[in-house]
Design a protein with these regions (language model features):
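C-terminal and inter-domain tail/linker signature
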Residues: 1-127
Length: 127
């Protein structure tokens, strides 16, 4: 499946090694921010933060058809259990052109937003 390499990178918490999976003009839609992030550098920054915030992350389902894949996951942020999906859209060359993340419940979204804000505001937090 086209999404296997993305899944492996996410499960290994190693999106830096997977940079070439993303199209240069990839669009990332966050569950906590209305405006999408544009470009590979922005996506890499966000995903580098996410792997530090998510605890006990694991995919539980993967469905792919044509140029779209949906990967369902479970994770934790602090004491909040979260369920979510990564929706991947692929360009003709196989690169990921869009990544949309949706999570539930609302308390999990709040915990995620707070943890991400703290991490992204810290100049030394991202490794």
């Amino acid at each position: 499946m086209k999404s296997d390499a993305f899944r492996a990178a996410a499960e290994a918490k190693d999106f830096r090694a997977a940079e070439d999976l993303f199209a240069p003009d990839v669009t990332f839609r966050s569950p906590v921010v209305f405006k999408p992030y544009e470009g590979r550098d922005q996506v890499q920054l966000i995903l580098s933060a996410v792997v530090q915030v998510f605890e006990d992350f694991r995919y539980i389902e993967q469905v792919e058809t044509g140029d779209v894949a949906v990967l369902q996951f479970e994770t934790r942020v602090g004491d909040r259990q979260i369920q979510g999906v990564d929706i991947l859209k692929f360009a003709e060359d196989g690169a990921i052109s869009e990544l949309t993340v949706m999570v539930r419940p609302l308390s999990g979204i709040h915990a995620l937003a707070e943890a991400m804000q703290k991490l992204l505001e810290s100049p030394t937090a991202l490794r």
